[in-house]
From Swiss-Prot:
It comes from Lactococcus lactis subsp. lactis (strain IL1403). Disulfide bonds join 10-13. It is found in: Cytoplasm. One of its GO terms (biological process) is negative regulation of DNA-templated transcription. Signal peptide: none annotated. This is Global transcriptional regulator Spx 2. Interacts with the C-terminal domain of the alpha subunit of the RNAP.
Amino acid sequence: MITIYTAPSCTSCKKAKTWLSYHHIPFNERNLIADPLSTTEISQILQKCDDGVEGLISSRNRFVKTLGVDFEDISLSQAIKIISENPQIMRRPIIMDEKRLHVGYNEEEIRAFLPRTVRVLENGGARLRSAI
């Protein structure tokens, strides 16, 4: 089952939920602000994140700038603690299942959550349309 971590005012989160619903992909939603992640949950997400802490943090976020922390200069445990205490610094949405993780909304990349059969059918249709 897919879990999507969101924030109420996040436009990208709304787009991701709409996309998942449109494609009839069931998901559980968790509001990161109302129900912040534990340090254990953040660690589990980071294990799947190819870009490490930098892939999870929104560097343009005003809260990150206010903190004045250079995440490259601190330990992983310190970064996890800061993230757990300041969930608003995370990029959103965070979409994950048992195997995959995607941070942010990119319609092409989110397609990884479509079942393989659907991706193959849609790609075949796109190729056919481009050949015409």
